[in-house]
């Protein structure tokens, strides 16, 4: 269709029709969940590799094993907002994490974490005492604070990061 035809059609649109289109667009924009990244500032160091953490996300859903509802903090060097927004399952939320750390809360007396570097070619999992996290905000919709630990004695990473993560996704499937 030539561009002139499109312009003529738009000009001939009745004002109430244009208002309906605008209202529909606004309704869609408001109803779509946005996985906007929170801020993170710090690093994860593992042997000779370092990742600068810049993005923080908080997601909520069932644990893959226990099916118990947990919160997962994802700290990443790269923006994975679009990937998290597209997730239908909890296990998907950190599957595209290539440089960073995910930490599971509410699943027991210790924090479970998974560190990845170099496009997931380097991975390390461990557990930590909850005391390594000092929160300044911790409720159903937001977690903020400082996360510092040194797991190098066990062959793991050293992490020092300050973050502020809003809840970006709630899931019902593990």
Protein language model features and the residues they cover:
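Sec/Tat signal peptide C-region and signal peptidase I cleavage site
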Residues: 32-36
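Charge-rich, low-complexity N-terminal segments
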Residues: 37-58
């Amino acid at each position: 269709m030539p561009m002139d035809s499109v312009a003529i059609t738009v000009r001939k649109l009745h004002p109430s029709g244009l208002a309906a289109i605008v209202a529909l667009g606004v309704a869609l924009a408001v109803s779509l969940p946005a996985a906007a990244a929170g801020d993170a500032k710090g690093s994860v160091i593992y042997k000779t590799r370092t990742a600068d953490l810049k993005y923080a996300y908080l997601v909520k859903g069932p644990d893959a094993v226990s099916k118990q509802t947990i919160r997962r903090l994802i700290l990443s060097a790269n923006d994975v907002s679009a990937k998290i927004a597209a997730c239908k399952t909890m296990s998907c939320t950190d599957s595209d994490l290539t440089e960073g750390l995910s930490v599971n809360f509410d699943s027991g007396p210790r924090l479970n974490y998974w560190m990845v570097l170099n496009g997931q070619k380097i991975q390390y999992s461990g557990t930590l005492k909850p005391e390594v996290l000092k929160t300044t905000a911790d409720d159903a919709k937001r977690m903020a604070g400082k996360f510092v630990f040194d797991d190098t004695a066990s062959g793991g990473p050293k992490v020092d990061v300050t973050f502020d993560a809003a809840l970006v996704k709630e899931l019902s499937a593990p």
